[in-house]
Curated annotation (Swiss-Prot):
This is Urease subunit gamma. It is an enzyme of class 3 (hydrolase). GO terms for cellular component: cytoplasm. The gene is ureA. It is found in: Cytoplasm. It catalyses: urea + 2 H2O + H(+) = hydrogencarbonate + 2 NH4(+). The keyword Zinc-finger does not apply. The lineage of its organism: Bacteria, Bacillati, Bacillota, Bacilli, Bacillales.
Amino acid sequence: MRLTPREIDKLLVVVAADLAYRRKERGLKLNYPESIAIITYEILEGARDGKNVAELMELGKNILSAEDVMDGIADMISDIQVEATFPDGTKLVTIHQPIH
């Protein structure tokens, strides 16, 4: 199987998000990389499902809460930018204050 660097990056996001979801299900609070992975994964999948940029920006704010993450993590993540592929091309989705 031959993957482009972009496809490898997306695959790594999926694996990291899967691990993070498993830890969350076990009741563990998420760290910084786990939080970023879950939000990024949901944005990429939302774009694949046909949601537009505005919908994804709103979705990104409702994926995780401060109760889901370790102390201080919500304050560390002020913005997340995800380059997502839409039917009409690639667009940058920015989520401001994704965890509150």
